[in-house]
Structures are given as structure tokens and as C-alpha cells.
């Protein structure tokens, strides 16, 4: 008896020590909001994934995420010979672990159909069993009745859209007309669909990016090829489930994948400004000025198309600084650049104006 009692604290200590390595992410912010790092599309053994649900929480914590959704398929259970079909099981198993790790666990499911309509995640649902319906529209209706955020997943996935080009079908237009579609994956797994930027802009939908992980995340997005999984950045009033949901319906989202950020035009400029700072010129030789440009984020900023009298291209490294030497005229007018890795449309990147700080 005595032996058992002493074993308990040692076991707890080992558990805490093994899990105590969270990566802190530095990403752009929107003034007045907190940036929540999120992955809203992942699978477990309860559909076609290969991991137990609580592993998703540990992975998310180590990866520096704030919120996740486990979205097992409603209509596809390849492991059912060994694991019973239970659409709430993953959420039930992962919930207490999420509470221990301070991870916001959104309850979700993936409605899984042929294209059209394809695959759609229902997020913030309460009763996944109610989505088990032959009629697709009835399944979405049931989700929406629970206050769901409906995300159209990987619309250009080659298994369903062989040329990789996403297309809106009548069923998607019908969903939009009813107010039953709220976001589209611009980025999924390791691929992205440029036209989704325009679809979201034209239809007032949130742009989303998720891992759609089925195996172990650190193996599917392994270093050195990947420094982080693809994720949705959500600009919420607070770090709570309610604020997260409000922000998503209000379309305050961006997608971070590789060294790129995809964001709606109206959010892109403030996001860039939140991490890039131009210093006061520290040298002036009467013809040219020298000033520093620094970046506090994990995302290098790749500038091109600079005007005459300034560098044509500049990369401000992640957590780094460069010195800009430019014509003195830029004391009175901004230096203009395209930011090649901040994507605002299928054919557009962010344009910025940079002015050295005033003395
Ligand atoms: Zn999926």
C-alpha cells in the first residue's frame, strides 16, 4: 500500500515533464484583438486517422496552438471492425485533456460527400449524431440549427476535382444564399487553392487553413521542410470559445502556411504593420539616408518592386532586421513595396508604404 502511494506523485511528475515543451509562436496581430492559432481539421482513429484523440491535444499544445477541432468523418469509418462508431467519442476523450492544457476544443464533424458538394466541416456543433442523414442539405440544416460554422474543405482536392481548380456548384451557391456556408479552406494539408481567396472575398466568407492531419503531426509536417503546420489565425476579442466563434463568423481570419500569410485585403496591411517597424534614420549624408527595418514575427517579409532610389528587393528576416539605404527624398514620401508573401487575392499581394520614423 505504501509503495503505491509514493508511485502516484512520481508518475504525475514524469507526465508533466514529458509534456512541458510548448513552442511559442510569434505571428501578426490586429489592433484590439488577440491572435488565436488554430487548426480546425484533423482526424483520429474514430474515422480514418491513426492516432487516439488525446494525442491531438498534446500535439496542439506543443505546436503552440490555442484552439483545435477534431473533425472525424460522419460517413466514413474504415476502422469500425475494431473501433465502434461514435461521432462524439473523440470529443469526449479529448475534452478533459484539452482542459488540462488550456486548449480550446471545438466540437466538430466532417460531412463527407462526393463533389458536389464535397467535404464540409461543421464546427461548434453539439450533437454530431444529428448530422447522420442521407439528404446533404438536411445534414447541414441540422448543423446550422446548432449554431454551426460551416467550412467547405479542400475544394480543389484532386481526388474530387482532377484539375485541382475549385469550382462553385449550384449546391454551394444555395448554401451561401441560405447563409449556411461561412468559410472555405484556402489551404489544406500541403496544397492551396488560389481562387478561394476571390471566392471568399466575393461571397463574404472566412478564409481557412488547416492540416487535415491523419497521422502524427510531427511526422506529416517534419523539420526541416516544415517549421510549423498550416493554421488558421483568428483575430478574437478574447481567448475564449465564444470570442473565437464570433471572430470566425465576422471573417477575421488569415492563413499561415510555410513563409506565407493569406489574408483579406482589409486585414493584410494592419497585420504587416503589427510586426514591421521602421526606425529613425541613423545616418544622413546629404544625398541618402540609412534606417533600420525590423520584424518581430516568425514570418520573413519578402518585399519587391521598390522604387528608384531604394532597394528593389528586401527580405526582412523572421525576428531580424535589415538596414535600408535610400534616397533622401524618402524623408518626405514613403517607400512603396509589394509584399510577395502576403497574399490578398488569387492574383494579388499586399502593397505597402514604408516611411522611416520621424525624430
Ligand atoms: Zn478531413
Regions found by a protein language model. Give the residues of each.
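Compositionally biased, intrinsically disordered low-complexity segments enriched
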Residues: 15, 43-45, 335
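Bacterial N-terminal signal peptides that target proteins for export
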Residues: 1-8
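A metal-dependent hydrolase metal-coordination microenvironment
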Residues: 23-149, 153, 161-162, 166, ...
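Charged catalytic cores and adjacent phosphate/nucleic-acid-binding surfaces used
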Residues: 2, 21-38, 57, 115-125, ...
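Amphipathic, positively biased hydrophobic alpha-helical segments used for protein targeting
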Residues: 9-11, 60, 330
Amino acid at each position: 500500500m505504501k509503495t503505491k502511494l509514493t508511485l502516484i506523485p512520481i508518475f504525475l511528475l514524469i507526465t508533466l515533464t514529458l509534456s512541458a515543451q510548448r513552442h511559442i509562436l510569434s505571428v501578426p496581430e490586429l489592433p484590439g484583438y488577440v491572435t488565436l492559432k488554430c487548426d480546425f481539421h484533423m482526424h483520429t482513429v474514430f474515422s480514418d486517422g491513426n492516432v487516439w484523440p488525446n494525442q491531438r491535444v498534446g500535439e496542439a499544445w506543443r505546436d503552440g496552438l490555442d484552439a483545435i477541432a477534431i473533425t472525424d468523418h460522419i460517413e466514413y469509418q474504415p476502422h469500425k471492425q475494431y473501433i465502434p462508431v461514435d461521432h462524439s467519442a473523440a470529443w469526449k476523450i479529448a475534452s478533459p485533456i484539452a482542459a488540462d492544457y488550456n486548449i480550446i476544443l471545438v466540437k466538430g464533424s466532417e460531412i463527407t460527400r462526393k463533389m458536389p458538394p464535397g467535404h464540409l466541416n461543421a464546427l461548434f456543433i453539439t450533437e454530431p449524431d444529428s448530422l447522420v442523414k442521407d439528404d446533404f442539405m438536411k445534414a447541414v440544416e441540422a448543423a446550422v440549427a446548432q449554431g454551426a460554422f460551416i467550412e467547405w474543405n479542400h475544394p480543389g482536392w484532386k481526388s474530387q476535382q482532377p484539375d485541382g481548380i475549385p469550382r462553385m456548384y449550384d449546391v454551394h451557391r444555395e448554401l451561401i444564399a441560405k447563409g449556411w456556408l461561412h468559410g472555405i479552406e484556402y489551404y489544406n494539408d500541403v496544397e492551396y487553392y488560389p481562387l478561394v481567396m476571390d471566392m471568399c472575398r466575393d461571397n463574404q466568407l472566412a478564409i481557412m487553413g488547416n492540416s487535415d492531419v491523419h497521422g502524427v503531426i510531427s511526422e506529416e509536417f517534419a523539420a526541416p521542410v516544415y517549421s510549423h503546420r498550416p493554421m488558421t489565425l483568428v483575430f478574437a476579442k478574447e481567448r475564449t470559445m465564444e470570442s473565437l466563434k464570433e471572430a470566425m463568423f465576422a471573417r477575421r481570419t488569415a492563413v499561415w502556411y510555410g513563409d506565407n500569410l493569406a489574408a483579406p485585403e482589409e486585414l493584410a496591411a494592419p497585420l504587416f504593420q503589427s510586426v514591421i517597424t521602421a526606425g529613425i534614420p541613423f545616418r544622413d549624408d546629404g544625398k541618402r539616408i540609412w534606417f533600420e527595418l525590423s520584424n518581430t514575427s516568425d514570418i520573413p517579409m519578402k518585399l519587391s518592386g521598390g522604387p528608384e532610389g531604394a532597394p528593389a528587393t528586401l527580405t526582412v528576416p523572421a525576428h531580424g532586421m535589415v538596414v535600408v539605404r535610400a534616397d533622401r527624398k524618402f524623408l518626405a514620401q514613403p517607400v512603396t513595396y509589394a509584399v510577395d508573401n502576403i497574399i490578398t487575392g488569387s492574383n494579388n499581394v499586399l502593397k505597402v508604404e514604408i516611411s522611416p520614423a520621424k525624430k
